[in-house]
């Protein structure tokens, strides 16, 4: 069976200093979001990204990929609120994962795997979005 070594040096650096984070971090660390349904992106998001003003900041570039900021997550204890755009909000609950999950980066060019972070929590959004009035 094929195998590959896992480099945990990046994760060790992250646990020693929170200033060196390479992932989006919450007060509880990196988290998984579980939503019901799908997030629909605009079909012409590439042209929207070119027209995006720095003040809006909905689009950014990382490693040649266009990233879309679709919302704002607020966590208050065990409750979470996800604002999607300016029209909807989701109410959710923060839960601890039974088994922590490792976030890994696979580099197929040199056949290496890097442990980037470990998730211990997830936010579950069970209900339909609520309109923002």
UniProtKB/Swiss-Prot annotation:
Cross-referenced Pfam families: Ctf8
Subcellular location per the Swiss-Prot or TrEMBL entry: Nucleus
Keyword line: Cell cycle, DNA replication, DNA-binding, Nucleus
GO CC annotations, alphabetized: Ctf18 RFC-like complex
Highest taxon, organism lineage: Eukaryota
Disulfide bonds: none
Biological process annotations from GO: DNA replication; maintenance of DNA trinucleotide repeats; mitotic sister chromatid cohesion; telomere tethering at nuclear periphery
Molecular function, one GO term: DNA binding
Family annotation (PANTHER family): CHROMOSOME TRANSMISSION FIDELITY FACTOR 8, CTF8, CHROMOSOME TRANSMISSION FIDELITY FACTOR 8 HOMOLOG (S. CEREVISIAE)
Function, in words: Essential for the fidelity of chromosome transmission. Required for the DNA replication block checkpoint. Component of the RFC-like complex CTF18-RFC which is required for efficient establishment of chromosome cohesion during S-phase and may load or unload POL30/PCNA. During a clamp loading circle, the RFC:clamp complex binds to DNA and the recognition of the double-stranded/single-stranded junction stimulates ATP hydrolysis by RFC. The complex presumably provides bipartite ATP sites in which one subunit supplies a catalytic site for hydrolysis of ATP bound to the neighboring subunit.
Similarity comment: family membership: Belongs to the CTF8 family.
Subunit structure: Component of the CTF18-RFC complex, which consists of CTF18, CTF8, DSCC1, RFC2, RFC3, RFC4 and RFC5.
Stated name of the protein: Chromosome transmission fidelity protein 8
Source organism (scientific name): Saccharomyces cerevisiae (strain ATCC 204508 / S288c)
Gene it is expressed from: CTF8
């Amino acid at each position: 069976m094929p195998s590959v070594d896992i480099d945990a040096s990046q994760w060790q650096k992250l646990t020693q200093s929170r200033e060196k984070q390479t992932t989006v971090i919450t007060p509880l660390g990196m988290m998984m979001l579980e939503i019901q349904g799908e997030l629909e992106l605009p079909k012409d998001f590439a042209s929207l990204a070119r027209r995006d003003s720095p003040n809006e900041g909905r689009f950014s570039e990382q490693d040649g990929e266009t990233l879309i900021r679709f919302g704002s997550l607020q966590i208050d204890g065990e409750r979470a609120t996800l604002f999607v755009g300016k029209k909807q909000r989701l109410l959710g609950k923060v839960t601890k994962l039974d088994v922590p999950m490792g976030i890994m980066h696979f580099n197929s060019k040199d056949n290496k795997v890097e442990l980037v972070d470990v998730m211990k929590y997830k936010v579950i959004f069970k209900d339909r979005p609520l309109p923002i009035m």
